[in-house]
A protein has these predicted regions:
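Short, glycine-rich, amphipathic interfacial segments at transmembrane boundaries or analogous
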Residues: 32, 100-140, 200-219
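Hydrophobic alpha-helical segments characteristic of transmembrane helices
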Residues: 22, 27-29, 157-160, 206-209
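N-terminal hydrophobic signal-anchor/signal peptide
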Residues: 1-78
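A hydrophobic, helix-centered structural microdomain
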Residues: 60-124, 161, 230, 236-242
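A short, hydrophobic C-terminal helix/tail in secreted or cell-surface proteins
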Residues: 243-248
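Short acidic-hydrophobic surface loop/beta-edge motif
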Residues: 42, 100-105, 194-195
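C-terminal terminal-structure detector
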Residues: 189-242
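A short, structured surface patch at a secondary-structure boundary
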Residues: 134-197, 236
Length: 248
Protein backbone atom coordinates (compact mmCIF):
# COMPACT_ATOMS: atom_id res chain seq x y z
CA UNK A 1 0.00 0.00 0.00
CA UNK A 2 1.19 3.52 -0.83
CA UNK A 3 0.19 6.57 1.21
CA UNK A 4 0.60 10.13 -0.09
CA UNK A 5 -1.03 13.47 0.65
CA UNK A 6 -3.11 12.10 3.54
CA UNK A 7 -3.72 14.22 6.66
CA UNK A 8 -1.63 13.06 9.63
CA UNK A 9 -4.68 11.95 11.69
CA UNK A 10 -6.07 9.74 8.93
CA UNK A 11 -2.60 8.54 8.07
CA UNK A 12 -1.98 7.38 11.64
CA UNK A 13 -5.22 5.38 11.59
CA UNK A 14 -4.22 3.71 8.32
CA UNK A 15 -0.69 2.99 9.57
CA UNK A 16 -1.87 1.43 12.83
CA UNK A 17 -4.32 -0.78 10.97
CA UNK A 18 -1.79 -1.91 8.37
CA UNK A 19 0.93 -2.63 10.93
CA UNK A 20 -1.57 -4.61 13.00
CA UNK A 21 -2.57 -6.63 9.93
CA UNK A 22 1.00 -7.18 8.78
CA UNK A 23 0.51 -5.09 5.63
CA UNK A 24 3.57 -3.32 4.22
CA UNK A 25 3.04 0.42 3.79
CA UNK A 26 5.12 2.75 1.61
CA UNK A 27 4.75 6.37 2.72
CA UNK A 28 5.67 9.18 0.34
CA UNK A 29 6.99 11.63 2.95
CA UNK A 30 6.70 15.34 3.43
CA UNK A 31 9.84 17.29 4.33
CA UNK A 32 8.81 17.19 8.00
CA UNK A 33 8.69 13.39 7.86
CA UNK A 34 12.19 13.30 6.39
CA UNK A 35 13.48 15.57 9.16
CA UNK A 36 11.88 13.33 11.79
CA UNK A 37 13.43 10.23 10.23
CA UNK A 38 16.84 11.41 11.39
CA UNK A 39 15.73 11.92 15.00
CA UNK A 40 17.42 10.30 18.00
CA UNK A 41 15.18 8.23 20.33
CA UNK A 42 15.56 9.13 24.00
CA UNK A 43 13.59 9.04 27.24
CA UNK A 44 12.97 12.06 29.44
CA UNK A 45 10.73 12.49 32.48
CA UNK A 46 9.62 8.85 32.07
CA UNK A 47 8.45 9.64 28.53
CA UNK A 48 9.73 8.48 25.14
CA UNK A 49 11.22 11.46 23.32
CA UNK A 50 12.60 12.00 19.82
CA UNK A 51 15.42 14.54 19.69
CA UNK A 52 15.35 16.48 16.44
CA UNK A 53 18.25 18.83 15.75
CA UNK A 54 20.91 19.81 13.27
CA UNK A 55 22.10 16.94 11.12
CA UNK A 56 25.40 15.76 12.60
CA UNK A 57 27.35 12.93 11.00
CA UNK A 58 29.78 11.07 13.25
CA UNK A 59 33.45 12.17 13.29
CA UNK A 60 34.45 8.67 12.15
CA UNK A 61 32.18 8.88 9.11
CA UNK A 62 33.44 12.34 8.18
CA UNK A 63 37.08 11.25 8.57
CA UNK A 64 36.72 8.18 6.35
CA UNK A 65 34.68 10.11 3.79
CA UNK A 66 37.31 12.86 3.56
CA UNK A 67 40.06 10.26 3.26
CA UNK A 68 38.17 8.62 0.39
CA UNK A 69 37.73 12.02 -1.28
CA UNK A 70 41.47 12.70 -1.16
CA UNK A 71 42.51 9.25 -2.42
CA UNK A 72 39.94 9.08 -5.24
CA UNK A 73 40.57 12.64 -6.44
CA UNK A 74 44.37 12.18 -6.46
CA UNK A 75 44.19 8.84 -8.29
CA UNK A 76 41.62 10.25 -10.71
CA UNK A 77 43.74 13.30 -11.51
CA UNK A 78 46.77 11.12 -12.27
CA UNK A 79 45.00 8.45 -14.32
CA UNK A 80 42.79 10.86 -16.24
CA UNK A 81 45.46 13.49 -16.94
CA UNK A 82 45.71 12.55 -20.67
CA UNK A 83 41.92 12.91 -20.97
CA UNK A 84 42.16 16.30 -19.22
CA UNK A 85 44.65 17.49 -21.84
CA UNK A 86 42.64 16.21 -24.82
CA UNK A 87 39.40 17.73 -23.49
CA UNK A 88 41.06 21.08 -22.75
CA UNK A 89 42.46 21.29 -26.29
CA UNK A 90 39.06 20.39 -27.78
CA UNK A 91 37.24 23.02 -25.71
CA UNK A 92 39.76 25.72 -26.63
CA UNK A 93 39.25 24.99 -30.34
CA UNK A 94 36.40 27.53 -30.47
CA UNK A 95 38.71 30.31 -29.29
CA UNK A 96 37.48 30.58 -25.69
CA UNK A 97 39.04 29.45 -22.41
CA UNK A 98 39.14 25.74 -21.58
CA UNK A 99 37.91 26.14 -18.02
CA UNK A 100 34.89 27.84 -16.55
CA UNK A 101 34.59 29.04 -12.97
CA UNK A 102 31.32 29.75 -11.23
CA UNK A 103 30.42 30.60 -7.63
CA UNK A 104 28.46 27.85 -5.89
CA UNK A 105 27.48 27.13 -2.28
CA UNK A 106 28.71 24.25 -0.15
CA UNK A 107 28.31 23.38 3.55
CA UNK A 108 26.83 26.15 5.73
CA UNK A 109 26.33 28.31 2.65
CA UNK A 110 30.06 28.85 2.14
CA UNK A 111 30.73 30.14 -1.40
CA UNK A 112 33.44 28.59 -3.54
CA UNK A 113 34.44 28.60 -7.20
CA UNK A 114 33.47 25.37 -8.93
CA UNK A 115 35.71 24.41 -11.83
CA UNK A 116 34.37 22.86 -15.04
CA UNK A 117 35.37 22.45 -18.64
CA UNK A 118 33.50 25.17 -20.51
CA UNK A 119 30.55 23.72 -22.43
CA UNK A 120 28.73 26.96 -23.30
CA UNK A 121 29.52 30.02 -25.38
CA UNK A 122 31.69 32.64 -23.68
CA UNK A 123 28.77 35.11 -23.79
CA UNK A 124 26.20 32.61 -22.44
CA UNK A 125 25.26 34.97 -19.59
CA UNK A 126 26.39 38.31 -20.98
CA UNK A 127 23.37 40.02 -19.37
CA UNK A 128 24.49 38.79 -15.94
CA UNK A 129 21.26 36.87 -15.26
CA UNK A 130 21.64 33.37 -13.81
CA UNK A 131 19.77 30.78 -15.85
CA UNK A 132 19.42 27.03 -15.39
CA UNK A 133 20.40 24.97 -18.40
CA UNK A 134 17.43 23.70 -20.38
CA UNK A 135 19.22 20.52 -21.41
CA UNK A 136 20.55 19.37 -24.78
CA UNK A 137 18.35 21.87 -26.64
CA UNK A 138 19.98 24.85 -24.90
CA UNK A 139 21.36 26.93 -27.78
CA UNK A 140 24.13 28.30 -25.55
CA UNK A 141 25.90 24.91 -25.55
CA UNK A 142 28.76 24.59 -28.05
CA UNK A 143 29.31 21.59 -30.33
CA UNK A 144 32.16 20.35 -28.17
CA UNK A 145 30.05 21.17 -25.13
CA UNK A 146 27.35 18.72 -26.22
CA UNK A 147 29.94 15.94 -26.42
CA UNK A 148 31.66 16.58 -23.10
CA UNK A 149 28.32 16.97 -21.32
CA UNK A 150 27.06 13.70 -22.76
CA UNK A 151 30.21 11.96 -21.49
CA UNK A 152 30.27 13.90 -18.18
CA UNK A 153 33.76 15.14 -19.10
CA UNK A 154 32.83 18.72 -18.21
CA UNK A 155 32.79 17.64 -14.55
CA UNK A 156 36.34 16.24 -14.49
CA UNK A 157 37.98 19.46 -13.15
CA UNK A 158 35.79 19.16 -10.07
CA UNK A 159 38.27 16.54 -8.87
CA UNK A 160 40.40 19.59 -7.98
CA UNK A 161 37.51 21.00 -5.94
CA UNK A 162 37.23 17.65 -4.15
CA UNK A 163 40.95 17.53 -3.40
CA UNK A 164 40.82 21.08 -2.08
CA UNK A 165 37.89 20.21 0.20
CA UNK A 166 35.18 22.41 -1.32
CA UNK A 167 33.32 19.36 -2.60
CA UNK A 168 32.91 15.74 -1.61
CA UNK A 169 32.45 12.92 -4.10
CA UNK A 170 28.92 12.38 -2.77
CA UNK A 171 26.64 15.11 -1.47
CA UNK A 172 23.88 17.46 -2.57
CA UNK A 173 24.82 19.15 -5.84
CA UNK A 174 26.01 22.74 -5.21
CA UNK A 175 23.73 25.53 -6.38
CA UNK A 176 24.52 29.08 -7.42
CA UNK A 177 23.72 31.68 -4.71
CA UNK A 178 21.01 33.26 -6.89
CA UNK A 179 19.33 29.93 -7.60
CA UNK A 180 19.63 28.84 -3.95
CA UNK A 181 17.99 32.10 -2.82
CA UNK A 182 15.15 31.51 -5.26
CA UNK A 183 14.65 27.95 -4.00
CA UNK A 184 14.71 29.16 -0.37
CA UNK A 185 11.88 31.58 -1.15
CA UNK A 186 9.83 28.82 -2.75
CA UNK A 187 10.89 26.07 -0.30
CA UNK A 188 12.22 27.42 3.04
CA UNK A 189 13.40 23.90 3.91
CA UNK A 190 15.99 24.19 1.14
CA UNK A 191 18.35 25.85 3.64
CA UNK A 192 18.60 22.51 5.49
CA UNK A 193 20.34 21.11 2.42
CA UNK A 194 23.35 23.30 3.26
CA UNK A 195 24.05 21.32 6.43
CA UNK A 196 26.18 18.91 4.39
CA UNK A 197 29.13 19.44 2.07
CA UNK A 198 28.12 19.62 -1.58
CA UNK A 199 29.12 16.78 -3.88
CA UNK A 200 30.15 15.83 -7.41
CA UNK A 201 27.11 13.58 -7.46
CA UNK A 202 24.34 12.92 -4.98
CA UNK A 203 21.29 10.95 -3.94
CA UNK A 204 18.89 13.08 -5.97
CA UNK A 205 21.11 12.88 -9.06
CA UNK A 206 21.27 9.08 -9.25
CA UNK A 207 17.78 8.22 -8.00
CA UNK A 208 15.88 11.18 -9.42
CA UNK A 209 14.76 11.51 -13.02
CA UNK A 210 14.86 14.42 -15.46
CA UNK A 211 11.25 15.32 -14.59
CA UNK A 212 11.66 14.91 -10.81
CA UNK A 213 10.44 18.12 -9.18
CA UNK A 214 12.83 20.33 -7.18
CA UNK A 215 10.74 19.60 -4.05
CA UNK A 216 11.11 15.84 -4.49
CA UNK A 217 14.84 16.23 -5.15
CA UNK A 218 15.09 18.26 -1.96
CA UNK A 219 13.43 15.45 -0.01
CA UNK A 220 15.89 12.95 -1.50
CA UNK A 221 18.87 15.08 -0.50
CA UNK A 222 17.52 15.60 3.02
CA UNK A 223 16.96 11.84 3.35
CA UNK A 224 20.60 11.30 2.43
CA UNK A 225 21.81 13.94 4.89
CA UNK A 226 19.65 12.54 7.70
CA UNK A 227 21.10 9.03 7.29
CA UNK A 228 24.85 9.29 6.55
CA UNK A 229 26.26 5.95 5.41
CA UNK A 230 29.48 4.95 3.69
CA UNK A 231 27.61 2.03 2.10
CA UNK A 232 25.09 4.45 0.59
CA UNK A 233 27.95 6.67 -0.60
CA UNK A 234 29.50 3.68 -2.36
CA UNK A 235 26.17 2.76 -3.99
CA UNK A 236 25.73 6.33 -5.25
CA UNK A 237 29.27 6.34 -6.67
CA UNK A 238 28.65 3.06 -8.50
CA UNK A 239 25.33 4.29 -9.90
CA UNK A 240 26.95 7.55 -11.03
CA UNK A 241 29.76 5.65 -12.75
CA UNK A 242 27.25 3.31 -14.39
CA UNK A 243 25.12 6.22 -15.62
CA UNK A 244 28.20 7.97 -17.02
CA UNK A 245 29.24 4.79 -18.84
CA UNK A 246 25.74 4.40 -20.30
CA UNK A 247 25.82 8.01 -21.52
CA UNK A 248 29.03 7.30 -23.38
Amino acid sequence: MFISGVHSHERNIILKYCVGQGINVFVIPRVGDVIMSGSQPMHMFHLPVLRVGRYMASPEYLFVKRLMDIVVSLVGLVILSPLFLITAIAVKSDGGPAFYKQVRLTKDGKPFEILKFRSMRVDAEKDGVARLSTGDKDDRITKVGHVIRACRLDELPQLLNILKGDLSIVGPRPERPEIAAQYCEEMPEFALRLQAKAGLTGYAQVYGKYNTTPYDKLQMDLMYIAHPSLIEDLKICLLYTSDAADDK
